[in-house]
């Protein structure tokens, strides 16, 4: 995979700068609470903002928010069946634990040359039944510019698939990090004493899932397509992983 020099987030930073250069105004710290619909169109969104509740009107609305939240925000504008189907759409959340280490206990046995001769993978999927860990990210291979000293250290991300509010999601950060390190030790990837820094992130609705009410997704799409000025985009906006 090819990533921007400073990681995937740089794509959106560049996009934000470009649209602002064209006169767009970006509102941060706003949370959409209600979508006002009228005559087959979206008329406005009601938001919680640092200045209190505000109503923002527009001609065109592009939504990347989760479909279940979008439909819930429409309230009575959506038929009861559509609200029920959207509320039942499932998601998989995940926790990622980032670790900075001087080396990995994995050998680069390929012909690919890498900085520090680390393994060349962007991701490694974990199939070891002894651990909960699902995937290892190697950020050096996304872009070496994401790491301060890519020749002597490695930033890895450990992905755990879970559900918002479950025991793993709610685990204190220190305990979660210790658990992640112990799993890597079990697999011979790192040693506990090698960890130079760590960081834990929780990601809600990371993956839209294809079960429960998803089999009726076409009904939800048909309903949303009825709004001529509403465009649903992205993974959560379309409840579609790829």
Predicted segments with their positions:
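Short Gly/Pro-enriched loop/turn and capping motifs at secondary-structure junctions
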Residues: 163-165, 205-206, 238-239
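General small-molecule cofactor/ligand-binding pocket signal
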Residues: 25-27, 196-199, 231
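Active-site-adjacent bridging/hinge elements
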Residues: 224-232
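Mid-domain catalytic core of redox enzymes
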Residues: 30-189, 193, 201, 214-216, ...
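Short beta-strand to alpha-helix junction loop
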Residues: 1-18, 27, 168-175
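Short glycine/threonine-rich loop-to-helix capping motif typified by GTGT followed
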Residues: 205-214
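A conserved beta-strand/loop element that lines the FAD pocket in flavoprotein oxidoreductases
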Residues: 19-33
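A conserved FAD-binding loop/helix module that cradles the flavin
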Residues: 234-242
């Amino acid at each position: 995979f090819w990533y921007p020099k400073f990681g995937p987030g740089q794509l959106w930073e560049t996009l934000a700068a470009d649209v602002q250069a064209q006169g767009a105004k970006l509102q941060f710290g706003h949370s959409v609470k209600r979508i006002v619909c009228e005559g087959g169109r979206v008329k406005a969104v009601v938001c919680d903002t640092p200045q209190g509740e505000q109503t923002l009107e527009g001609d065109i609305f592009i939504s990347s928010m989760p479909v279940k939240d979008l439909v819930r925000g429409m309230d009575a504008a959506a038929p009861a069946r559509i609200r029920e189907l959207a509320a039942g759409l499932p998601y998989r959340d995940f926790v990622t634990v980032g670790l900075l280490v001087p080396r990995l206990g994995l050998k680069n046995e390929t012909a690919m040359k890498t900085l520090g001769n680390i393994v060349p993978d962007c991701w490694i999927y974990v199939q070891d039944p002894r651990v909960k860990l699902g995937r290892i990210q190697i950020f050096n291979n996304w872009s070496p510019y994401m790491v301060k000293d890519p020749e002597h250290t490695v930033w890895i991300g450990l992905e755990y698939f879970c559900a918002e509010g479950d025991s793993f999601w709610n685990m204190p950060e220190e305990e979660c990090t210790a658990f992640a390190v112990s799993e890597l030790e079990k697999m011979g990837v790192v040693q506990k004493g090698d960890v130079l820094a760590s960081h834990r992130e929780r990601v809600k609705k990371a993956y839209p899932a294809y079960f429960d009410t998803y089999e009726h997704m076409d009904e939800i799409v048909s309903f949303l397509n009825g709004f001529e000025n509403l465009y649903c985009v992205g993974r959560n906006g379309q409840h579609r992983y790829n």
